[in-house]
């Protein structure tokens, strides 16, 4: 059975590179009818925290990536936190010492970086006197090779490696040792991970060989890069799933975009993961690094916002507002839906959607500085707004066609140019110069609200 794992370290928020690795593992497991395991690699005692662990789990859930075994739900091969498996690592490390494939190293008490001697016998006396003791793995001469699913045949000369620590003096394992023991005991069949782990692979394969265990199939995925073609980091901009969620990126759009980063997908590049799941093949992943394009992500997100059912978008928007701490004023349900319908055509994120919808939902909106300076301070502003108010008041049928006719008739009265007339009215009823189409904006606002807002702007004009 296919068994894959995603094993983050809880030392920070979930990076988009980690999310993409989790996605590829999850897709492979789901397509093959296998298991997706979540393991927490928290042996970095200084930087790891349960708070980060919970944030990572929450980000994965938001991404739509569920797991079959993990620290929160358990499973047949737990515990799923490395900090809860210390006795297991100690037992296996001591077995390597027994087999003369590893040995104890005793260090100077005053200078812990200074090795005093090595031994195959546990140095009780020195340990009791406070000397640091580690276990080192013995690197044998020769070559270590494996077939990478993406990169092909890989070979390393063992002479380039020195004996390396597998158990630290504090009783915690090092990464390369713990990951081998865990992957073997958890019966992991495939390891898909970033190519930054490629240099770890020969050490891990040596440990597999020392135990006489079969190694999993490895695939090392090229990293996500910044605009300067170096690994994506904070200096390029935001990198965490949590940030993009807070900015109003839909989870389905983020997963869509991350899948496009390196996976050759046939057909339309706007899709849900479920739509492409059965066509996923790890061998279709590119062997070249890919640049994270923030604008492309927004574009993909905008496509999804206009693609999904209005009720789904409404639910996503309300959930996002709660998460981002944004208040949604209480308005009529139908009015809210109509506002959402016309506003989603103009924006690419839920955050932008909130900004453009806000004046629709709040009568106490502010006027943009550009509107006031470029239009409201014009000599003809008051006359245009008064005429608009009168024309709308006399309008019996409130629909887009009649509204358009009314505004075009008004613009032909010679009060001002059509652009000035339209922008004066647009800003008067929303406070903004960029909105959905003016005619449909006024139609959705309704007659009563439009008249009140024109009067409000006239009063504002008289005070300034």
Swiss-Prot record:
Give residues annotated as binding ATP.
Answer: 234
User: CDD domains attached here?
Assistant: GluRS_core (cd00808)
Q: Which GO terms describe its cellular component?
A: cytosol
Residue numbers covered by motif 'KMSKS' region: 231-235
Q: Which reaction does it catalyse?
A: tRNA(Glu) + L-glutamate + ATP = L-glutamyl-tRNA(Glu) + AMP + diphosphate
Q: Which PANTHER family match?
A: GLUTAMATE--TRNA LIGASE (PTHR43311), GLUTAMATE--TRNA LIGASE, MITOCHONDRIAL-RELATED (PTHR43311:SF2)
NCBIfam families reported for this sequence: gltX_bact
Q: Which Pfam families match?
A: Anticodon_2 (PF19269), tRNA-synt_1c (PF00749)
| Cystine bridges | none
Enzyme Commission code: 6.1.1.17
What InterPro entries does its record include? aa-tRNA-synth_I_cd-bd, aa-tRNA-synth_I_codon-bd_sub2, aa-tRNA-synth_I_CS, aa_tRNA-synth_I_cd-bd_sf, Glu-tRNA-ligase_bac/mito, Glu-tRNA-synth_I_codon-bd_sub1, Glu/Gln-tRNA-synth, Glu/Gln-tRNA-synth_Ib_cat-dom
Q: Which GO terms describe its biological process?
A: glutamyl-tRNA aminoacylation
Q: Which GO terms describe its molecular function?
A: ATP binding; glutamate-tRNA ligase activity; tRNA binding; zinc ion binding
Cite the HAMAP family for this sequence.
Answer: Glu_tRNA_synth_type1 (MF_00022)
What PROSITE patterns does this protein map onto? Answer: AA_TRNA_LIGASE_I (PS00178)
Keywords per UniProt: Aminoacyl-tRNA synthetase, ATP-binding, Cytoplasm, Ligase, Nucleotide-binding, Protein biosynthesis
Task of the protein: Catalyzes the attachment of glutamate to tRNA(Glu) in a two-step reaction: glutamate is first activated by ATP to form Glu-AMP and then transferred to the acceptor end of tRNA(Glu).
Q: What is this protein called?
A: Glutamate--tRNA ligase 1
Give the UniProt family note.
Answer: Belongs to the class-I aminoacyl-tRNA synthetase family. Glutamate--tRNA ligase type 1 subfamily.
Span(s) of short sequence motif 'HIGH' region:
8-18
| Assembly and binders | Monomer.
